[in-house]
Swiss-Prot record:
Residues 38-131 form the GOLD domain. The keyword Zinc-finger does not apply. Keywords: Endoplasmic reticulum, ER-Golgi transport, Golgi apparatus, Membrane, Protein transport, Signal, Transmembrane, Transmembrane helix, Transport. The lineage of its organism: Eukaryota, Fungi, Dikarya, Basidiomycota, Ustilaginomycotina. Constituent of COPII-coated endoplasmic reticulum-derived transport vesicles. Required for efficient transport of a subset of secretory proteins to the Golgi. Facilitates retrograde transport from the Golgi to the endoplasmic reticulum. One of its GO terms (cellular component) is Golgi apparatus. InterPro entries: Emp24-like (IPR015720), GOLD_dom (IPR009038). The gene is ERV25. PANTHER family: TRANSMEMBRANE EMP24 DOMAIN-CONTAINING PROTEIN (PTHR22811). Pfam families: EMP24_GP25L (PF01105). This is Endoplasmic reticulum vesicle protein 25. The keyword Transmembrane applies. It is found in: Endoplasmic reticulum membrane; Golgi apparatus membrane. It comes from Mycosarcoma maydis (Corn smut fungus).
Length: 224
């Protein structure tokens, strides 16, 4: 019989994994413009993570795509500013797959360009975006069919992948914390050294002032 405490811990872990595996989905309208601004949807992703981007682009009635062009670009916010994919004139459902190179925010960016005017109205598209990262991007149904896994085994395989992602993220956070601690230590040492040098300089200046004034007073015969 499993102890109640173990059951509680297992349930808590499963709840954490469940909420961690939620995919990012959003739906929004994007009006066209001759000089369009770029709208980006950002999600954090670890390095070497599989990311599946599914974008459904539909022109809002009464417009079509004859007067507007939607471009998509997948980038990240790392210091390298990686551009993973760039595709122009997308319509309908577009599915993109990438592998990340850095621990950074991953941006899926859209731009709707007005190619020609259509009366006084501005053409608009509706974008339904779904971003799956890591374990959520893996097709476990295909794996289950290939390896003849049961439903429970498939779920356990998925939870195992999510748990590995959590471990990797915790390791990354630990390394980042160590780097920040090293930076703080280095900064504190520099501040301490600067304070010591400043104190030594003030003492040296004070000693010099004493000898200078002593010599001045002797020349003026104010002291012996």
């Amino acid at each position: 019989m499993i102890p109640p405490r173990s059951l509680g811990s297992t349930a808590a872990l499963l709840l954490v994994l469940l909420f961690t595996t939620l995919a990012s989905a959003i739906k929004f309208d994007l009006p066209s413009n001759a000089h369009p601004h770029t709208k980006c949807i950002w999600n954090y992703a670890l390095s070497d993570s599989l990311v599946i981007v599914t974008a459904s682009v539909v022109a809002k009635e009464p417009f079509d795509f004859s007067h507007q062009r939607v471009d998509i670009e997948v980038v990240d916010g790392s210091q390298h500013n990686n551009v993973y994919l760039s595709k122009k004139a997308i319509k309908g459902e577009t599915r993109l797959a990438i592998n990340t190179h850095s621990h950074a925010d991953l941006g899926v960016c859209f731009k709707n360009t007005l190619t020609s005017k259509s009366g006084n109205q501005i053409p608009v598209v509706t974008i339904d975006l779904d971003v799956d990262i890591g374990a959520d991007a893996v097709d476990y149904n295909a794996i289950a069919n290939q390896e003849s896994l049961s439903g429970l085994e498939t779920e356990m395989r998925k939870l195992e992948a999510v748990a590995n992602e959590i471990v990797n993220e915790m390791e990354y956070l630990k390394k980042r914390e160590l780097r920040m601690a090293d930076t703080n230590l280095s900064t504190n040492m520099r501040v301490t050294n600067f304070a010591i040098l400043t104190l030594i300089a003030l003492i040296a200046l004070g000693v010099w002032q004493v000898f200078h004034l002593r010599g001045f007073f002797k020349r003026k015969y104010l002291i012996d």
